[in-house]
Amino acid sequence: MDIIFKDLINLWGKPVNKEKIDLNLPIGSISTDTRTIEKGNFFVPLVGKNFDGHNFLNMAFDIGVQGAIVSKEFNGSIPAGLPHWVVSDTLDAYQQIALLHRRNLNLPVIAVTGSVGKTTTRELIRGVLSSLGEIVSSTENENNEIGVPKTLLRGMGSDAAFVLEMGMRGLGQIECLSRISEPDIAVITNVGQAHIGI
């Protein structure tokens, strides 16, 4: 990860417990899941209908994360020594980090969407481009507001390109995913009636 802590200050201001970190060091790999988190990672607790990642802040701290993002709506326990930024929305912050990483890498981004055929088209493009080097591509469930940033954050400077799949579950979602990823090339497989009711 090429993002340093000072970059996060440019996004959200100074963190709580700023003295605990060297602002010129990389923030480490981004993790949203304490089941796979490792020492030196940066923790982003996401919130859903049936879960709240903030409940695992203490576990993440015990594992040895370098820092975290915390929603201003969270009223629970935050480890006393944890460097963290307080933000309005942790998902939005996660997306901002992914966009910053995408811009730093400056790799070509190809986005694929459409009523049908997205996954097949994505895999065909990935296969064609594979002769150029490593292609970072969406997996089956990485085509939404959480998955697209996750794919972008997997990218490295040695990679050749991103091929992203973008699904739509609501009005404005493709616009949101496009803002996160800033695609250089957009592929629309077709436009049918699959999402008329959304």
Language model segments and positions:
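Phosphate-binding loop of NTP-binding sites
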Residues: 12, 93-198
